[in-house]
């Protein structure tokens, strides 16, 4: 089903709005993927705050013009799924993890911070912990000495109470 010009303009505007707020765009090729698998991919993307769409490449090329993602335009060939996220690693993580489980999805390229990334670089980006994971690790590292000191004081107080 082809879109009329107004629908195409609306799609380009929607994608442009998503790209304006995004830090990362990852593209992956899909061939012969089952509907149930694509539905699972869409659900995982939604859970992780990733905007995921299958679009005409010409429409996406128009949407990326003048954005930091313009360098990906020459990679937009074939049946592609586009993952866009404001989180620097979420889009890469979702597509990379899904590609490991389903060989019909192949991560082709990505763009982060104005740089075009090849598939290996997208895999590296996907291996970086998310901001929330890093903050929780930092909090644990900061709390561990204080918690240990509190336990030592409690044990000392308990020992003195037994002695008295």
From Swiss-Prot:
Keywords: Ribonucleoprotein, Ribosomal protein, RNA-binding, rRNA-binding
Tagged with keyword Nucleus: no
Gene Ontology BP annotations: translation
Molecular-function GO term, any one: large ribosomal subunit rRNA binding
Pfam families cross-referenced by the UniProt entry: Ribosomal_L10
Family label: Belongs to the universal ribosomal protein uL10 family.
UniProt protein name: Large ribosomal subunit protein uL10
Organism: Chromobacterium violaceum (strain ATCC 12472 / DSM 30191 / JCM 1249 / CCUG 213 / NBRC 12614 / NCIMB 9131 / NCTC 9757 / MK)
Upper classification of the organism: Bacteria, Pseudomonadati, Pseudomonadota, Betaproteobacteria, Neisseriales
Gene name for this UniProt entry: rplJ
């Amino acid at each position: 089903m082809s879109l009329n010009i107004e629908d195409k303009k609306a799609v380009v505007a929607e994608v442009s709005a998503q790209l304006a707020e995004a830090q990362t765009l990852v593209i992956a090729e899909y061939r012969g993927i089952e509907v149930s698998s694509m539905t699972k991919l869409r659900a995982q993307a939604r859970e992780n705050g990733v905007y995921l769409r299958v679009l005409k490449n010409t429409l996406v090329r128009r949407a990326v013009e003048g954005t930091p993602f313009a360098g990906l335009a020459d990679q937009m060939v074939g049946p592609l799924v586009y993952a866009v996220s404001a989180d620097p690693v979420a889009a890469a993580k979702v597509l990379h993890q899904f590609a490991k489980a389903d060989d019909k999805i192949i991560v082709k390229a990505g763009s982060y911070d104005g740089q075009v990334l090849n598939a290996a670089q997208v895999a590296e980006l996907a291996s970086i912990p998310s901001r929330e994971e890093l903050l929780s690790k930092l909090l644990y590292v900061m709390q561990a000495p204080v918690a240990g000191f509190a336990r030592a004081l409690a044990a000392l107080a308990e020992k003195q109470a037994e002695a008295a």
